[in-house]
Amino acid sequence: MKFLASVAVVAALVAPAAAQPAEHPAYGLELDGFDYPHPVQRYEFVSQGQRMAMAYMDVAPKSPNGRTVVLLHGKNFCAATFERQIRVLSDAGFRVVAVDQIGFCKSTKPQGYQFSFHQLAQNTNDLLKSIKVDKAVVLGHSTGGMLAARYALMFPKATERLVMVNPLGLEDWKAEGVPYATVDKLYESELKTTFETVKAYQLKFYYDGQWKPDYDRWVEMNAGMYQGAGREKVAWIGALTHEMIYTQPVVYEFPKISVPTTLMIGQTDHTAPGANRAPKETAAKLGDYAALGKKAATAIPGATLVEFPGRGHAPHVEAPEEFDAALLKALSASGSPTAP
């Protein structure tokens, strides 16, 4: 009996430890501590009266084909998420420039900044000019897709081709009935960000309930900044950029896009920022990317639609081989509208 009692005590002591949630890394304000796959450079400039720097990777191919691809990340992603695409594109002869936008990842986090897609597009164009990129394929994923569309509208002569990968902004959420949330309310929500909340959100909306251990790294990258010493600043930027996404639709200007365009759409994606604030019947209709992709392809003159059945919000992460093959095929296409 003594022996059994001892076993019970040991089991009781061990059980709580086993039940503890896994520890996840905390990163600095500029994603300090998270390694990128290539050397990170910084474009320093003044914007809205503030000195700041955009982090970026500029990867040269071994056998150049004379073309450049610019990669624009989403709100919950970074330039590093394109790790595989950088390699694939570089191997195919493309110069690849993967940018962390101001307010994100390894770039400056200005607290008193008027965030707009126009401003971010201007920053990006200035960066590209500084490294002598006059024209490029501009590929944007998620929020980066909205930015890429704005970039193509602002700088058509600098855009060889627009590629949007499950972009946000294929619908106007406020017009569809999603209530406005103040920056202060959004900040309160952003402060609650953890590995678990990010994973739960992505599992539901990005990956259609199918999780792979490989995704953990990207969740840790995003959530880790919310656990570090700069968490309040990171959360504030998150609130400002969420409001930017909600209040600055680009969908109404799709017919004005004049550059060759490819839409790459995972069909099971249901992403709709702010849907949790909307009435259930409204939320249920939002984020139908299978339908939204087709609608966008019709609205954009000469656009090509590439669909990924059974894939969600991040097909380049979820099905990289399938995605990369389709991307290289799209970049070899010709015969689309030409910018004036």
PLM features: residue spans?
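Glycine-rich "HGGG/HGxG" loop immediately N-terminal to the catalytic nucleophile
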Residues: 41, 80, 101-117, 173
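Conserved acidic catalytic loop of the alpha/beta-hydrolase fold
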Residues: 118-136
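N-terminal cap/lid segment of alpha/beta-hydrolase-fold proteins
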Residues: 28-59
